[in-house]
Amino acid sequence: MAHVGSRKRSRSRSRSRSGRRGSEKRSKRSSKDASRNCSASRSQGHKAGSASGVEERSKHKAQRTSRSSSTSSSSSSSSSASSSSSSDGRKKRAKHKEKKRKKKKKKRKKKLKKRVKEKAVAVHQAEALPGPSLDQWHRSAGEDNDGPVLTDEQKSRIQAMKPMTKEEWDARQSVIRKVVDPETGRTRLIKGDGEVLEEIVTKERHREINKQATRGDGLAFQMRTGLLP
């Protein structure tokens, strides 16, 4: 009987131990399942969070690209508008300058035409009013006996005022005359109205001319300074 009781006790103990082991195994399994479920839920949450972050990032990128495109389009439109306005301003300035230049040209042409007309009128008036001739002087002298009598010098001046032909001019310019300088005493050859000619002389004649010239220079100096009585 004692042996049977010991067997029963050992069986009950083994059963209780096996029950405990089973319960421990079950608890371990349940804890493992719970940990697995937690890790799975965590991984799912992490995946969901990462997916939402990716979506938000993609949204931000799209917004940035749209903003950059809008800013670039606005800047390009503003630059094109500024360039068009600057080109319009340049064209207006060029047109204004061209108008000013044309006005100045017209004014210059008018002034030139006016001057030419004035000169032509003056020349025509001078031609229409000729100066007094020698015949007119003679007529006036014959008509008015009480008037002044013309001298030879006045007659020569009046004659010089008359137009001469080419033959008369050549004959006048071909006349050679000797003129004595009162200050130096030198005798010069003058052709026509004032062309001075050189006279070819010998050495002795040249010395005499120089002596006369120096003597005349001295006398002229003494007369100017008052040294001569």
Swiss-Prot record:
Residues 1-152 are annotated as: Disordered. Pfam families: SR-25. There is a cross-link at K191 (Glycyl lysine isopeptide (Lys-Gly) (interchain with G-Cter in SUMO2)). The keyword Hydrolase does not apply. It comes from the Eukaryota. Belongs to the ARL6IP4 family. Involved in modulating alternative pre-mRNA splicing with either 5' distal site activation or preferential use of 3' proximal site. This is ADP-ribosylation factor-like protein 6-interacting protein 4. It comes from Mus musculus. The gene is Arl6ip4.
